UniProtKB/Swiss-Prot annotation:
Disulfide-linked positions: 39-121
Source organism (scientific name): Rattus norvegicus (Rat)
Pfam families in the record: 7tm_4
Lipid bilayer topology: Multi-pass membrane protein
Classification of source organism: Eukaryota, Metazoa, Chordata, Craniata, Vertebrata
Described function: Possible taste receptor.
Alphabetical list of SUPFAM superfamilies matching this protein: Family A G protein-coupled receptor-like
PROSITE patterns: G_PROTEIN_RECEP_F1_1, G_PROTEIN_RECEP_F1_2
Family: Belongs to the G-protein coupled receptor 1 family.
Keyword Transmembrane: yes
Annotated protein name in UniProt: Putative gustatory receptor clone PTE38
Amino acid sequence: MYLFFSNLSFNDICIITTTIPKMLMNVQSHDQSITYLGCLSQVYLIVNFGSIESCLLAVMAYDRYVAICHPLKYTVIMNHYFCVMLLLFACSLALHMCLFHILMVLILTFCTKTEIPHFFCELAHIIKLTCSDNFINYLLIYTVSVLFFGVHIVGIILSYIYTVSSVLRMSLLGGMYKAFSTCGSHLSVVSLFYGTGFGVHISSPLTDSPRKTVVASVMYTVVTQMHGPFIYSL
């Protein structure tokens, strides 16, 4: 579990450093411009680290399931080799995910001077500002995202269904409280990350007001990561 915590914390730092330093530099210099290559780099890194975050949250849900439902077999099932392989598999999935999205952005054409109503280059806003037809991009992005993140969400839900049913059968109140507190902190992060993330990408093509999507983006790229250590320490 601590291996996943450490990697999740490192990934959270990477997500924050992808967006906040550039935003602060823009505020200090009063220059809101960003190069095309720099914008693509932000899209790539955000999608990559966001995908890794999703994979890690799903893996941690499975880890909690094994720890609570099969405590005597935990060290056998979640051995170091298996945990490392899960992390490598998560990074590999995230890499393929972000490469797909970057390739889909590269085939689009943009005007010479385009204003992004956001504090960083977010994929949904970039596609919305293209000068070419973006229907295929939206269709493929939503299809792939639903399949990619949907599998993680279903896995998390199934893990917690079995976990909660196992906790409710516990006779000791102390063990039940400890199990619920551990699961509750993880579920809080999951709800905050997926809720705001899906809100941004679903509402972006449907609304003309960027303010709401910017607030949601701050929640899943900054607030979730900064509050993660505090939530897990409760």
